[in-house]
Regions:
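Domain-level signature for soluble enzymes in the chorismate/prephenate branch of the shikimate pathway
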Residues: 2-174
Length: 174
């Protein structure tokens, strides 16, 4: 969880930090915790994060998950680049099933989220017997519910959506 003092000093000079995901994603929450006064830029893919990171800009990539192991896409993109790793952060991930404010868990027919989240919650989802739809990130899956306008679709993301009155946490700690 710690980064070296040398890295901290060097990081004062960065302009932007790129991350994969939408506002409200786990990656953004890591950035807010460790770098509260920097500019964050959303990316749809790990490849985009790596392409944007460089001397004046940093990128944040998830590289390992205690439930499903290595985040292979992150590693592959990092290895193919000439970037250096400057620090490591640990973030406890607690997924929740989230629907629109009037949704009921027994009516959910389709669940959308990042492929890693779908895999991490596979036991819970198997018991639900629902259609799974991978999308580019967890927070984005919940935000997309507003466009879908269906109470039969849910997303998997962090429990912090509980405070947003547009959504309802249908099940915590899945």
């Amino acid at each position: 969880m710690a980064i070296s003092r040398q890295s901290i000093i060097y990081m004062k000079n960065i302009n932007k930090i790129y991350y994969q995901g939408s506002k409200g994603s786990y990656s953004e929450s890591v950035l807010k915790s460790y770098f509260p006064n920097k500019q964050y830029v959303e990316c749809q893919t790990f490849r985009e994060v790596v392409a944007q990171a460089g001397e004046d800009n940093y990128g944040l990539l998830p590289v390992e998950n205690s439930l499903v192991g290595t985040v292979i896409d992150s590693y592959e993109n990092l290895i193919q680049s000439e970037l250096n790793v400057y620090g490591e952060f640990k973030k406890k991930i607690t997924h929740a099933l989230i629907g629109l404010k009037d949704a009921k868990i027994e009516n959910i027919e389709r669940v959308i989220s990042h492929p890693q989240a779908l895999q991490q919650c596979s036991n819970f989802l198997q018991d639900m017997n629902v259609q799974l739809q991978p999308v580019f990130d967890t927070a984005g899956s919940v935000l997309s519910l507003l466009d879908e306008e269906s109470e039969n679709i849910a997303g998997i993301a962090g429990e912090h959506f509980e405070g947003d009155n547009r959504f309802k946490v249908l099940k915590k700690s899945i």
